A protein has these predicted regions:
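Conserved N-terminal diphosphate/IPP-binding helix and adjacent helical/loop segment
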Residues: 7, 12-133, 137, 141-156, ...
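Alpha-helical phosphate/pyrophosphate-handling elements in metalloenzyme active cores
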Residues: 85-127, 177-178, 221-264, 300-302, ...
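All-alpha helical catalytic cores of prenyl diphosphate-utilizing isoprenoid enzymes
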Residues: 81, 96-100, 164-165, 182-281
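Hydrophobic packing residues in well-ordered alpha-helices of helical domains and bundles
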Residues: 57, 64, 68, 121-124, ...
Length: 383
C-alpha cells in the first residue's frame, strides 16, 4: 500500500499489503489469477508464499551474472601479483571450480540498496571472496575433506604445507587489496578493516567450537546457533555491514544491514542442514542424510537427541562414519516423523522472516527487492 502521512515511516506487515493490494482494492478476485500474476512481488502469510519459486532464483542469478565478471577480474588481477608460481597456483585453485560468488557480489547489491553503490564495493567483494576461500582451504585441511567444488581440495592437489601457506597469503592479499583501493576512503578503511578482522576471528572461533562439538556428549541449540553464527553467518553479516559503510549509510542503517546479513546466514546454514536430509543423492553428490553417519551436531540432530524419542535407526547410525548407507532412508524417516526436520525448517523460516523485517525498514526500491529475492533464494533451494 502507498505509505502517506502517518504511515510513511511505518512498517506494514507484508501479509496485509498483499491482502490490501490484491483483495480489498478490487471488488472480486480469483485466487489462481492472483497467484499467477505474482511475477516479482513477495506475498507471505506464515510459511505460505504465493510467488513463483523460480523467480527469486532467476532474479538473484541474473544479478550475480551482471556483476560476477567484474569481481572475477579484480580477483584474478590481484592473484596475479603472486610471483611464486606454485603458490599462485594453489591460491587460484578453488577459483577454477566456479561458484556463484554470492559473498563477492553482495557488497554491491547492498550498496545499491542503502545508498551509493560504487567501484569500491567490487573491490570489497573481491577481498571477502578471497578471504572466504582462505577459510575453505584451511577448513579442508582441518576436516581432511578431499573434494571442494568438484575439484581436489588444495591440500590434495598440492600438499598440506603449500595449502596452509596459500591460505595465509590469501588472507594477507585481501587486506592489501583494501588498502590499495582508490575507491575506498581513508575514513572508511579503518571501519571496514576492523569489521573484516572481527569476521575472521569469529569464523575461527566457530570452527573451533565445531571441532569440540565432535567430542561432546551433548550440544545445546543455543550453542549450535552460536557456532554457526561465527562459522557461517559472520561472513554474511560482515558482507552486508561493510557494504553499508562504503555506501555512506548512517549508523542505524549499518546495524540494520548487519542484522539482515546475520539472519540471512543463519537461514542459509540451517537450510543446508535441512537439504542434507530432504534432497536426493544425485542432487547432493552424496547420500541424503550423510550428516547422520558423520555425527554432525546439526539443529536436526540436536532436536532429535534432546527429544527423548526412541529413533532406533538414527541412534544406531549417528556418528558411526559407516559407509553402508542402506539404512539412512529409515533414519531420515524417523527424524521426519519425530518432527526434527520440520523443526529445523521452522527455525530457518524464523530467520528468513527476521531478515525480511530488516529490509522492511529500507525505502522499497528495485535494489531492495533484489535483496528480498536473495533472502527468498535461501528457501527456494529446497525446490
Amino acid at each position: 500500500m502507498e505509505r502517506k502521512g502517518r504511515w510513511k515511516s511505518q512498517i506494514i506487515a507484508p501479509w496485509f499489503e498483499a491482502i490490501f493490494h490484491n483483495f480489498l482494492l478490487s471488488g472480486d478476485f480469483n485466487i489462481e489469477e492472483v497467484v499467477s500474476n505474482q511475477k516479482s512481488e513477495i506475498i507471505r502469510c506464515g510459511t505460505l508464499s504465493v510467488k513463483h519459486p523460480e523467480n527469486s532464483a532467476s532474479n538473484v542469478l541474473a544479478a550475480l551474472g551482471e556483476h560476477r565478471d567484474i569481481v572475477e577480474e579484480i580477483i584474478q588481477q590481484n592473484l596475479s601479483k603472486i610471483q611464486q608460481e606454485r603458490l599462485r597456483g594453489a591460491m587460484s585453485h578453488l577459483f577454477t571450480g566456479g561458484g556463484k560468488r554470492l559473498r563477492a557480489i553482495m557488497p554491491r547489491l547492498v550498496g545499491d540498496a542503502v545508498g551509493y553503490g560504487h567501484e569500491g564495493h567490487y573491490t570489497l567483494g573481491a577481498c571477502i571472496e578471497i578471504i572466504h576461500n582462505f577459510t575453505l582451504v584451511h577448513d579442508d585441511i582441518m576436516d581432511q575433506d578431499p573434494i571442494r567444488r568438484g575439484l581436489d581440495a588444495v591440500h590434495v592437489a598440492y600438499d598440506n604445507a603449500t595449502a596452509i601457506n596459500a591460505g595465509d597469503a590469501m588472507l594477507a592479499l585481501g587486506f592489501e587489496m583494501l588498502a590499495d583501493s582508490p575507491h575506498i576512503q581513508d575514513g572508511q578503511l579503518r571501519d571496514v578493516v576492523s569489521a573484516i578482522g572481527e569476521m575472521v576471528r569469529h569464523v575461527a572461533e566457530g570452527q573451533q567450537e565445531d571441532f569440540e562439538f565432535e567430542d561432546r556428549v551433548s550440544v545445546s541449540e543455543d550453542e549450535y546457533i552460536s557456532m554457526i553464527a561465527g562459522k557461517t553467518s559472520a561472513m554474511f553479516e560482515t558482507c552486508a555491514e561493510t557494504r553499508a559503510i562504503l555506501a555512506g549509510a548512517d549508523t542505524n542503517a549499518v546495524a540494520n544491514m548487519a542484522d539482515w546479513g546475520l539472519n540471512l546466514g543463519l537461514c542459509f546454514q540451517i537450510m543446508d542442514d535441512y537439504i542434507d536430509m530432504t534432497s536426493d543423492t544425485e542432487t547432493l553428490g552424496k547420500p541424503a542424510g550423510s550428516d547422520i553417519v558423520q555425527g554432525k551436531r546439526t539443529l536436526i540432530a540436536i532436536h532429535a537427541l534432546e527429544s527423548g524419542a526412541d529413533l532406533p535407526t538414527f541412534r544406531k547410525l549417528f556418528g558411526t562414519e559407516s559407509t553402508d548407507t542402506d539404512e539412512l532412508p529409515v533414519a531420515v524417516k524417523e527424524l521426519r516423523n519425530n518432527g526434527s526436520i520440520q523443526y529445523a525448517l521452522d527455525r530457518a523460516m524464523e530467520h528468513h522472516r527476521i531478515a525480511h523485517r530488516c529490509l522492511d525498514k529500507l525505502e522499497q526500491t528495485p535494489a531492495v527487492n533484489l535483496l528480498r529475492d536473495m533472502t527468498d533464494f535461501q528457501l527456494v533451494r529446497i525446490n
